[in-house]
């Protein structure tokens, strides 16, 4: 519609990953395969933890939260992405774009804070084992879970607020396969220097600080592991290694995307694809392959339901 000779943008055109039809078909098949693994994999972890009375430790409670976040995160982007692969015109309304952006940052930040909580849990378990059951009691676990979900909500509200006050009256082509702050900001018909700085502070700097803090925490934990017996040391190192791998997979793409908002890189879409599709798949795979208790419980659960 026309208002004072300015066209108010009511929808965005997503340019997608590539313009090649053959490449789109290949990516469609690969993404569909990944997605069909992500959802069952994560829900299997949740169901396994809920159904096994032996998996009641805080570590498994937080692992269940992680699986839920991963499943939800992939659900925000992947289904629409698959539909767009089969559509000639990839259009998303302004409201749908803002909604997608909100849930992406809500769940993404929640997962980031969850990794911090899991690092705290491992620190208490390894560095203060005699006080572990007192500190990490069920009430504390639920409180920490509430805090991380609330933290993700606040972070997402800030991200959405950065977008809502911007005027969009010109170009409406988003050079991506989903709505995210860096691409949307570039379409605003006003100077966005301050907004991009705020985005760096809210997303990029926060991700970087959490990343460095987590690495420092696990460095301290690994140093303390030397005091454990051989059996305890092996299990602790395995758990910490798993967490460190997840940290790099989570924070690497996030830091790349949100600390460089002023310029676009050819690898941006590939990094975004990894962050939204590949990473949620890697979490359950890494945890189940490296955690003997979860693997044993999962095998038991599957055998019960397959041969009942």
From Swiss-Prot:
Residues that span the membrane, as ranges: 26-49, 58-79, 101-120, 140-158, 196-219, 236-258, 270-289
Glycan attachment positions: 5
Segments in the Extracellular topological domain: 1-25, 80-100, 159-195, 259-269
Gene3D superfamilies: Rhodopsin 7-helix transmembrane proteins
InterPro entries in the record: GPCR_Rhodpsn, GPCR_Rhodpsn_7TM, Olfact_rcpt, Olfactory_Receptors
Keyword entries, A-Z: Cell membrane, Disulfide bond, G-protein coupled receptor, Glycoprotein, Membrane, Olfaction, Receptor, Sensory transduction, Transducer, Transmembrane, Transmembrane helix
GO cellular component: plasma membrane
Location in or out of the cell: Cell membrane
Cytoplasmic side of membrane: 50-57, 121-139, 220-235, 290-308
Molecular-function annotations in GO: G protein-coupled receptor activity; olfactory receptor activity
Membrane topology (UniProt): Multi-pass membrane protein
UniProt xrefs under CDD domains: 7tmA_OR4N-like
Name of a matching Pfam family: 7tm_4
Disulfide bond entries: 97-189
Function (record text): Odorant receptor.
Family from the record: Belongs to the G-protein coupled receptor 1 family.
Database matches in PANTHER family: OLFACTORY RECEPTOR (PTHR48002)
Name of the protein this chain belongs to: Olfactory receptor 4N5
Species, as recorded: Homo sapiens
